């Protein structure tokens, strides 16, 4: 590999270059008395720019552009740094222009809404961060971009209502209440028609009481958990008659 460098007092200074065997530039880096300070670029053997970075006093700084390849395809990643830490809006975009991901940092920590997209450009998952932890709503999506599950977080733990949805109808499939990462309080499950299928109560992340319903809305059974199993208190047929 051929290269060219300039030295001052034994330290690399100015633009440093290396070359591919065909004579084209492979890397270009700017130094200031041995410390990277300026752009850092890398090229393919055909001259195509594959990486464009920036340093200030040896630390990552400013806008970075990376051309990446994977088994899913080629993409471009745009990222920003400040004082060596991720800071600002990041994005990944497929070669056809469709988004792969959007994210943001503040002082090296995750901040704001992060979104990951499928190959077709539909969202797969969106998560809200604050101070590097999940804080706020998180949504996962079906392949058509409609919500599959929505949850709420507080300081990295599930808190509040979590809902799951049916793919075909989009109606609510279940809803649970969480507190400090555990299921706590009332919960409900639904048929794909939207009718109530089951409701009950959770304690310490376990279901302890439930009522089941027929699709026609009639009560089917009432049960409570005892000794690790369910004890049926009442049972009814589909006409509402007690068995």
Where in the sequence are the language-model features?
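Glycine/tyrosine- and acidic-biased, solvent-exposed loop/turn segments at the edges of beta-strands
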Residues: 1-243
